[in-house]
Amino acid sequence: MTAPTESSPFSPADLARHRLSPQEYRRITELIGRHPNLNELGMFSVMWSEHCCYKNSRPLLKGFPTTGPRVLVGPGENAGVIDIGDGLRVAFKIESHNHPSAVEPFQGAATGVGGILRDIFTMGARPIASLNSLRFGPLEDARNRALFRGVVHGIGHYGNCVGVPTVGGEVYFDPTYSGNPLVNAMAIGVLETPEIVRSGAAGIGNPVLYVGSTTGRDGMGGASFASAELSDASQKDRPAVQVGDPFTEKSLIEACLEAFRTGAVVAAQDMGAAGLTCSSSEMAAKGGVGIEMDLDLVPVRETGMVPYEFLLSESQERMLFVAEKGREGELIALFERWGLHAVVVGRVIGEPLVRIFHSGKVVAELPARALTDDAPVYPRAVLPEPPAAILKLRAFDWHSLAEPTDYAEALLTLLDSPTIGSKSWVYRQYDHQVQNNTVIVPGAADAAVIRVRPQSFGPGEVEAVPFTERGIAATVDCNSRYVYLDPYRGAMLAVAEAARNLSCVGATPLAVTDNLNFGSPEKPEGYWQLAMACRGIADACLELMTPVTGGNVSLYNETQSDGRTTAIYPTPTIGMVGLVEDIHRTCSQNFKSPGDLVYLLGGGEPTLGGSEYLACLHGVAAGEPPVLDMALEIQVQSVCRLGIERGLFKSAHDVAEGGLAVALAECCITGNLGLDAVLGANHPRADVVCFGEMAAAIIVTIDPCDQVACELWLECSLAERWKLLGTVAAQSFDLRVENRDCRISTSCERLKTTFEQAIPRRMEHIPVTEAPQR
């Protein structure tokens, strides 16, 4: 079509409020052959937002590997689905709720959990676990403490009330997140329906059902809000934050799963971002059909709502179904039995349009593809080389920095870092045992492990499998400082660490869901970070054979304050799931018995570049991140999994932030045991040996009775890439560096107190001088 010749009814200010550029408006008029009305402009505003259409990232996402022998559903549906054998299928996905959580932390985080759970059960899967990846500014700041407290409370409240265990996650703290926290929520479910539920509408004349809660004005324009930078004025956007009701969500889960098992549901889509607009247009476009709806039939919680508000509302706990004609009454009765609304609001039509009625009039009529597939895409030029500022940071010479005069105090300083310290303040607010399937609880290992129960497909129907020992392991990982210094290598390291964490509990990595949290793609450096990180994820996933089944992109994570714009560290969070063949053969990180032998498997070249040691003790974020030897990484992970499967390894823990000294201390703290060990002097500086970070490194313990057999096996499997470090002790922590005047000798109680108080003392605003003695 061609653009209309008459002048636009909308001013530049109108378009700016809808976050549409003049060029995008012209494209709209070309697609529909006329000027849109206000309702239609609002629909385009949300559907063409970065949050919904990925207009800046879509070309980059095409580089991800998305297929594999276990992948049943890849990107494009509500969640990815994989086959884990024994007739069991698992759905999983990660999504962000960053901007809402910055404005209203409790509701922003709570509805983030609710939204990701709906993505899971919309596929026909019962949610069995959730995880989260969180980023905040330093807790010394009162506003950051308030955001942290609100977000954790919101996650705990929603997850606890809805009855889905929060089994794991990660929390990082850095000044770049002070104005823009990150809240990424991941959920996992096991399919309870014979067929995977799809979202493409089908069957001309089939009724369209609105089910769930009522529609109000909450969350108005939330998708557009989530696609803009935050500023000092963002607090005025509180109406763009949704309000959740976990008890309604619990009923919705049960009602939907029961409805799917009847076979009366042709297609289903949850109403998340962009509400009715997104659910109707995506269902129509995916099915190659149209949908018409009458807004007068939509259940409401507020009076006087106009079509614009209906179409852009993001009220929670709502779904849109296409039902088999003649069976809508059966579904309505089912939902009413669960105390939920279920109303026929429209029908599937042959014309590929979304047609909206209100008060007997057509108030919006748009091609479904114009709202979805025809959204603009902006392939941008990638900088041919890193920005000068990044090159300068990478060239930082940390060799000139003074080494610690007291290595024990240096270790305690790292354990007191909220990024490294215990996250028990967080996970003790979560119910991680509800459903009674959690095999490994938060804080006990490098990944969560959840039992998978046999699934019944309905009354009188055969279970998927009569009995299984299988379980699912899950983790979320990303060292965003690495990604800031080197987006490509940092993203690869994030994927490798996620796989390593799964391997440390005995799980085989299977597939990935990613959450790309970045700044503005319109800035050359921002797009370069995004593009290079996507390449890193793609290459690492290919090497590890972990296809990407879906995810989320959150851009414009920048804060404008006092005329200055600050972007977050680029944070491509990797959610990864793995298969545990036997839940009775898993591994935790804690040392088990005095006298056990402690080994290091693998271990690349340690470096202080981008390390927590540099950040905590020197206030520096610079240098080259660790080098990743992917062949060694794969080899070390394979050995770790096999050692756990054989019952040889009693504990396993990967070496991450803080290096070997911190990893060993964590094993002691969680096991209430000590250590007597010597680190090989593989670097002239003792602080690099103790606190340098590396990839492909795992600490394991064995029973001394198995020493000869174990070392013969390690020699065959890893050649010289392993080392006996020492033994587990009863109470004291004694760590030395070979041929160096360096010794860390302290009590485990001192380590534990410092580690466990890292977050609580800051949340209680206790100065270091008044904190428990280290």
Curated annotation (Swiss-Prot):
One term under GO cellular component: cytoplasm
Top enzyme class: ligase
Principal location class: cytoplasm
Pathway this chain belongs to: Purine metabolism; IMP biosynthesis via de novo pathway; 5-amino-1-(5-phospho-D-ribosyl)imidazole from N(2)-formyl-N(1)-(5-phospho-D-ribosyl)glycinamide: step 1/2
Compartment list: Cytoplasm
Entry annotated with the keyword Ligase: yes
Amino-acid positions noted as binding substrate in the UniProt annotation, renumbered to this chain: S96, H97, N98, H99, R118, Q242, E314, S315, Q316, S554
InterPro entries according to UniProt: PRibForGlyAmidine_synth_PurL, PurL_linker, PurM-like_C_dom, PurM-like_C_sf, PurM-like_N, PurM-like_N_sf
Signal peptide (UniProt feature, chain positions): none
Residues annotated as binding Mg(2+) 1: E95, N552
Entry's Gene Ontology BP terms: 'de novo' IMP biosynthetic process; purine nucleotide biosynthetic process
Superkingdom per UniProt: Bacteria
EC number: 6.3.5.3
Catalyzed reaction equations: N(2)-formyl-N(1)-(5-phospho-beta-D-ribosyl)glycinamide + L-glutamine + ATP + H2O = 2-formamido-N(1)-(5-O-phospho-beta-D-ribosyl)acetamidine + L-glutamate + ADP + phosphate + H(+)
Active-site residues, as the UniProt record annotates them: H51, H97
A Pfam family matched in the record: AIRS_C
Alphabetical keyword list: ATP-binding, Cytoplasm, Ligase, Magnesium, Metal-binding, Nucleotide-binding, Purine biosynthesis
Amino acids binding Mg(2+) 2: D119, D270
Residues that bind ATP: Y54, K93, D514, G551
GO molecular function: ATP binding; magnesium ion binding; phosphoribosylformylglycinamidine synthase activity
Family to which this protein belongs: Belongs to the FGAMS family.
Free-text function comment from the UniProt entry: Part of the phosphoribosylformylglycinamidine synthase complex involved in the purines biosynthetic pathway. Catalyzes the ATP-dependent conversion of formylglycinamide ribonucleotide (FGAR) and glutamine to yield formylglycinamidine ribonucleotide (FGAM) and glutamate. The FGAM synthase complex is composed of three subunits. PurQ produces an ammonia molecule by converting glutamine to glutamate. PurL transfers the ammonia molecule to FGAR to form FGAM in an ATP-dependent manner.
Subunit structure: Monomer. Part of the FGAM synthase complex composed of 1 PurL, 1 PurQ and 2 PurS subunits.
Protein name according to UniProt: Phosphoribosylformylglycinamidine synthase subunit PurL
Species in which this protein is naturally found: Gloeobacter violaceus (strain ATCC 29082 / PCC 7421)
Gene assigned in the entry: purL
